[in-house]
Structure formats: C-alpha cells, structure tokens
Design a protein with these regions (language model features):
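C-terminal interaction modules
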Residues: 1-29, 50-54, 68, 85, ...
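Short, solvent-exposed loop/turn positions at domain surfaces
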Residues: 53, 59-61, 78, 126, ...
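Short N-terminal segments immediately surrounding and downstream of signal-peptide cleavage
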Residues: 27-45
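Flexible, membrane-facing loop/turn or short amphipathic-helix motifs
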Residues: 43-48, 76, 120-123
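N-terminal post-signal-peptidase region of extra-cytosolic proteins
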Residues: 46-62, 66-71
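Short, small-residue-rich packing micro-motifs
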Residues: 65-74, 83-137, 180
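Glycine-centered tight beta-turn/hairpin loop motif at sheet-sheet or coil-to-beta transitions
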Residues: 46-48, 77-79, 136, 188
Length: 259
C-alpha cells in the first residue's frame, strides 16, 4: 500500500537535510535529480502531472521515474542514491521518513532497464526497512550498493557491488570487499549475495534464482540494458546448470542446493 508520513517534525527534518545537500525542493519532496545527461526523461505524479527529469527537479513518493536516451541520478533525503541508465523505469512505491529511523521505510519497483541502488550513509532509513522489487524477485537490503537489470520479459540480473573504496574497474585478486549483502527472493526460493561482483539471474517469479556466481574483471560501465542480452559467461553457465538440475529433478529444483 502506498504510504507517506510527513508530520511537522519530519517536514522540518527533511527541509534541513535538503538544505545540507545544497538543494531546496518543495515541502513534499523526498529528494531530487542531481545529475542528468542525454535526452531528459520524465517524472509522472499520481495526479497525472508529468515533469521533465532535469537537475533539481524534486522527487515525491509514488512518482514514476523514466529515462529515454539519457541517464540520471536521484538523491533522497537520507542520501540513498539511485542511478538510471537509458530506457529505465522505476516506481517509488513507498517512502516513510521519520526522525525516528526505526519508523522510516523505503520501497521501490524496478520495472525495466538498469538501475543502481546505493543506500544512504546517514542511517536514516534502516536497511531492513528497504525493499526493492522487480517483476521476478524481491531484493532485501543488507548491503549498500547493487545493480539490477530488467528486460522486457521481466527477467532480472542482480549484481552486488564492492564497497566505495574500489575503483570502477577492480580485479578480484586485489581483495575488493563487498558493500554488504542482499537477498534475492521469489516463489522459487531465496539466494544471498555476499561477495563483491556476485550475481544471480531470475527468469520468472516461480523459478528460483540461479546459483550465485562471481563476475570476474567486471567494468561497472558495462552494466546497462545490453548486459542482460549479452550475458556474462558466468551467468550463462549458471543458467545452463539450473536447466540441467530442473531436467534431472523432473522440473522440481532442490532449493537446498542454493545454500
């Protein structure tokens, strides 16, 4: 259910945070666009109002944010950030911000395209109160930085990224630490990602995620909508192994194998 809680104390706290971030938005805004390149996308409100997604455009709860031939980054009042590549659609389905962090919540639906999610460093929204959904899975946050690519069929590729101390291109032998951990869950099972560049593919909501694999020599600039079409070899192998397991079990996969 959509929900937004902004009492007087909360609105004051939001205004203070937005001032600190260097951008002043409307009282109901929960963040705003702070980077944009290429063709501007759009922000659609529940009222039907459509805004151009350009720098300093405010973001409100329940907004649908969609890019065209361009990219943008959004920063929320708790410093959570999402980065959208071309032709990406994200729905902000819930944002409850309260001066008491335990009462704050965030939920988003990554509908299509490629989005990178990084939780805020202020701890204003507890990670356990953040939920990201795709058409085929629910992502529980116990980490801070990951990407999701969703194709036109809803298939989702989820990658846990390293911590902020790693460069854009990092070789695993350099000892890159993960940004935390995330769970990927659907009707077929649950998988936990807890290594830098660890990834899973989720084909349908009823089919369990593939076994986690580590993507070697990954350049973060490669992660866009083509990444799910031209899949990494590690993901292709994981999908083939899953198909073989399904055949061997007569279509029933033993989820204990995913631990």
């Amino acid at each position: 259910m959509h929900q937004l809680v902004l009492n007087k104390a909360t609105k004051f706290a939001v205004a203070v945070l937005l001032t600190v971030f260097g951008n002043i938005y409307a009282a109901d805004d929960i963040g705003g666009v702070y980077e944009q390149s290429g063709t501007p996308g759009s922000i659609t409100r529940t009222t039907g109002e459509e805004l151009t997604a350009q720098i300093d455009t405010g973001i409100q709860s329940y907004d649908n944010v969609e890019t065209e031939n361009g990219r943008l980054k959004i920063k929320f009042v708790d410093e959570t950030q999402i980065s959208l590549t071309e032709h990406t659609l994200v729905e902000i389905t819930e944002y409850v911000f309260d001066p008491d962090p335990s009462k704050s919540k965030m939920a988003m639906n990554f509908v299509a395209g490629t989005a990178r999610f990084a939780t805020g460093g202020l701890g204003l929204v507890p990670k356990e109160n953040i939920v990201i959904e795709t058409p085929t899975a629910t992502i529980g946050i116990r980490g801070t930085d990951f990407t999701t690519t969703v194709d036109e069929l809803g298939r989702s590729l989820v990658i846990l990224l390293p911590d902020a101390n790693c460069d854009d291109k990092v070789k695993l032998e350099e000892g890159c630490r993960p940004s935390g951990s995330i769970t990927v869950t659907n009707a077929g099972g649950v998988v936990t990602l807890e290594e830098a560049f660890q990834a899973v593919m989720v084909s349908t909501f009823e089919t369990a995620p593939t076994n986690p694999v580590v993507l070697v020599d990954l350049d973060l600039n490669q992660i866009d909508n083509m990444f799910i079409i031209s899949k990494p070899e590690e993901i292709i192998q994981a999908e083939e192994e899953q198909q073989e397991a399904l055949k061997g079990d007569g279509g029933l996969l033993d989820f204990t194998d995913l631990d």
